[in-house]
Each structure stands twice: as C-alpha cells, then as structure tokens.
C-alpha cells in the first residue's frame, strides 16, 4: 500500500504509550495527522507490525514468531501457545471478536435498565439483569422497557423461538454474505446493513476501528465476568454495587466479600 505513494516526509508522531514521541515516515494511508489542531489520530504502526505496542511495553520479552502484528489486538502475548497453529489462531480470532461483541451488548444491557429506573424513572418491575428474565413467569408477564405497548411477553417458548430466528438470520447473513446484505467477510460483513454509516470505507480508519473494537470487547468480557461474580456474591446489580462502593469504599469492596468463597464460611 505504501508503495503507491512516491513521496513521503519524516514527522514526529506523538503516541499515547508512555508519552513517547517517535520519528516515522509519513504515509497518508498509514498515518493520519490533523495538522490544523493539536489532536492526532494514531498511526496504525502503533498497533500493527513488528514495532507495535507489546503487552509489557518496553519490558516485553521476545514475542512468538507467529505473532507478527498482522492482526488487530496482537500484543505479542501467548504464553500457552494457543495461537501457534495457524488454523487454531484463525478460529480463536473469530471467537474473540464474536464473543467480544456479545459481551459489549451484554454489558450495556446489564447496566441500562438500572440506569433508566434510577435516574430516568422508567418503571421496570425488575431492573437487575439476572432477575429480570424471571418476570416472564409472573402473572403479568414481562414488559420490555417496562412498557406493555412494546413487547408484552408471556411465553418463554415464544421468546426463545423469536430469539433463535432473529439471531439465525443475522448470523446467516454474516457468514454467507448474501447479495445486497453483506460483503462476504465473516467477521466484518460491511455493506449497507452492517455498516450503514460507511465507517469502514477508509482503510486507515477501518484498521484503527478494528483495534478499538477488540480492546473494548476484551474489556467487556472481563466486565461481564465481574457482573457474574457480583451477582453470586452480593445478589445485586452492577450499578447498585458501584453506588454502594462509592458510598463506602472501605466496607463495600471485594475484600469484604472474599470470605464468601471460603469453604464452610
């Protein structure tokens, strides 16, 4: 890609990692610099290639030879050698992206009902994520967003059926790339339905968005794990746990509940 440009200039590109500033060869397809303002868009060489940021920064040991920085989110860390086999590596990349997307949606869905009920005064019968589903077995059923005019669910079988159909259609479009629906890429279908705003039209922006997606997806997966543990230990939702901690950090923290994991406690 860089060979298509006959001229380049050396610029100083600020990076967000350890406050470093490095000299690099400016390339319009690789580095996007807003010269009219102090805000810089990260160069893709910060996240891709042999000189990318590593998992321990400057203290990282030699990274495995198969982790070349070709793919987004590769920080050179694979202690267990899970990605040594190319086929396993490809499968794991796909699994991570898909699970990260589900986790981002899940984390958003876990927090939103509590936020809406507390500060927007939306009347949910049960805003806590791990308790809300049981409302479908109540006499009045389950109202989506607390509004009976949206979806008034009274049958768990009907909900599961619609879920399978809707998710199956989306996954089918994603994998098969039907004409006019997607572009045939399993992980990044694109097209007017999967990228209606054209966010991935520019290759530099697309490469940067892939990194942002995988980083936020990993964070969301850890968040969901934290929500699961909180639900088991405290029996409360994530927002209520957060507010309790902010109200009294000394009394409401992980250490205060650590004994609940001890046998016989």
UniProtKB/Swiss-Prot annotation:
Looking at the record's lineage, which domain of life comes first?
Eukaryota
Q: Upon deletion of the gene, what happens?
A: In koLhcb3, accumulation of LHCB1 and LHCB2 apoproteins to adjust photosystem II (PSII). However, altered macrostructural arrangement of the LHCII antenna and increased rate of PSII transition from state 1 to state 2. Increased phosphorylation level of LHCII. Reduced responsiveness of stomatal movement to abscisic acid (ABA), therefore resulting in a decrease in tolerance to drought stress. Deceleration of the fast phase of excitation dynamics in grana cores.
Locate the residues binding chlorophyll b 1.
55
Which positions bind chlorophyll b 5?
Answer: 163, 261
* Inducing factors: Repressed by high-light (HL) in a CAO-dependent manner (at protein level). Reduced levels relative to CP43 during high light acclimation, thus helping photosystem II (PSII) structural re-arrangement. Repressed by the herbicide bromacil (BRO).
Q: What is its main location?
A: plastid
List residues binding chlorophyll a 6.
245, 254
Boundaries of the annotated transit peptide in chain numbering: 1-22
Which amino acid positions bind chlorophyll a 1, per UniProt? 77, 83, 96, 218
Which residues belong to the signal peptide in this entry? none
> Where chlorophyll a 5 is bound, by residue?
212, 230
Give me the residues that bind chlorophyll b 4, please. Answer: 163, 174
Q: Where does chlorophyll b 3 bind?
A: 155, 171
The molecular function terms of the Gene Ontology recorded here are: chlorophyll binding; metal ion binding; protein domain specific binding
Q: What membrane topology does this protein have?
A: Multi-pass membrane protein
UniProt GO BP: photosynthesis; photosynthesis, light harvesting in photosystem II; regulation of stomatal movement; response to abscisic acid; response to herbicide; response to high light intensity
The UniProt entry's sequence similarity note says: Belongs to the light-harvesting chlorophyll a/b-binding (LHC) protein family.
Complex formation: Present in M heterotrimers. Forms heterotrimers with LHCB1, LHCB2, and LHCB5 proteins. The LHC complex consists of chlorophyll a-b binding proteins.
Protein name (database record): Chlorophyll a-b binding protein 3, chloroplastic
Q: Which gene encodes it?
A: LHCB3
């Amino acid at each position: 890609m860089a060979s298509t440009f006959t001229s380049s200039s050396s610029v100083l590109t600020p990076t967000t990692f350890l406050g470093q500033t490095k000299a690099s060869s400016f390339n319009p397809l690789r580095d996007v610099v807003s010269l009219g303002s102090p805000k810089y868009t990260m160069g893709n060489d910060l996240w891709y290639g042999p000189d990318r940021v590593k998992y321990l920064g400057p203290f990282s040991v030699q990274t495995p030879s198969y982790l070349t920085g070709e793919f987004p989110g590769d920080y050179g860390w694979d202690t267990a050698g899970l990605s040594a086999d190319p086929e396993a590596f490809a499968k794991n990349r796909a699994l991570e992206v898909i699970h990260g997307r589900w986790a981002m949606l899940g984390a958003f869905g876990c927090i939103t009902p509590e936020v809406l009920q507390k500060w927007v005064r939306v009347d949910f019968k049960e805003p806590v994520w791990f308790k809300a589903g049981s409302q479908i077995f109540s006499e009045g059923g389950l109202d989506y967003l607390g509004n009976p005019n949206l979806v008034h669910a009274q049958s768990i079988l009907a909900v599961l059926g619609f879920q399978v159909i809707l998710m199956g259609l989306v996954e089918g479009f994603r994998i098969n790339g039907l004409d006019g629906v997607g572009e045939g890429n399993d992980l990044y279908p694109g097209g007017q339905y999967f990228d209606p705003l054209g966010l991935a039209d520019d290759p530099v922006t697309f490469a940067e968005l892939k990194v942002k997606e995988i980083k936020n997806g990993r964070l969301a997966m850890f968040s969901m794990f934290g929500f699961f543990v909180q639900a088991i230990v405290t029996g409360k939702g994530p927002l209520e746990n957060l507010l309790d901690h902010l109200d009294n950090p000394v009394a409401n923290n992980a250490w205060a509940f650590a004994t609940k994991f001890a046998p016989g406690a």
